[in-house]
């Protein structure tokens, strides 16, 4: 068991903002990584190919419930966990912070801010891998623009770390919390 209550790292970010990159850096430091997109791919296949795009929220709901149950178990077992998911709204983030707190963990929200051009460059590059990579769900630029209108970045009253592409800085901050 870690010398501190386990961390639960939650991320707020749009597709292409670096969530998977950061979560993989945390797994290299011993974090358990939970990824709803990978579970969606495992259960249902390729987004927009094996199931219609419009049913994603309906199919995702039970996946998120199962990921939340797994999160509770991992945190109660004393493991540090990172949830590789976008958490687009304050309400969604509050719900998952409560799951972490109820399991005895310290929730840490990381905001992955990025410009439209940066997001679109990353998404368009990884779109070619969407058929075989659960972390490369195909999105058009108009999808990204629509998603941006639904994404609510953390505000000053919602404690968070700002990720600017430096995983080591996030790791150092987490280590300072447990010192």
What are these regions (language model features)?
Residues 11:
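Hydrophobic anchor at the beta1->P-loop junction of P-loop NTPases
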Residues 38-40, 113-119, 167-168:
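Conserved nucleotide-binding/hydrolysis micro-motifs of P-loop NTPases
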């Amino acid at each position: 068991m870690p010398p501190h209550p386990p961390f639960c790292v939650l991320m707020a970010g749009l597709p292409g903002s670096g969530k998977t990159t950061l979560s993989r850096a945390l797994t290299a430091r011993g974090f358990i990584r939970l990824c709803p997109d990978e579970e969606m791919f495992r259960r249902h296949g390729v987004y927009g190919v094996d199931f219609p795009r419009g049913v994603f929220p309906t199919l995702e709901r039970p996946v998120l419930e199962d990921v939340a149950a797994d999160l509770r178990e991992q945190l109660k077992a004393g493991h540090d966990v990172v949830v590789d998911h976008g958490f687009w709204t304050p309400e969604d983030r509050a719900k998952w912070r409560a799951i972490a707190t109820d399991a005895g963990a310290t929730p840490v929200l990381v905001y992955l801010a990025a410009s439209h051009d940066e997001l679109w460059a990353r998404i368009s590059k990884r779109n070619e891998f969407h058929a075989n990579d659960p972390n490369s769900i195909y999105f058009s630029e108009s999808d990204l623009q629509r998603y941006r209108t639904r994404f609510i970045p953390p505000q000053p009253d919602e404690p968070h770390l700002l990720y600017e592409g430096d995983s080591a800085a996030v790791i150092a901050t987490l280590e300072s919390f447990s010192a």
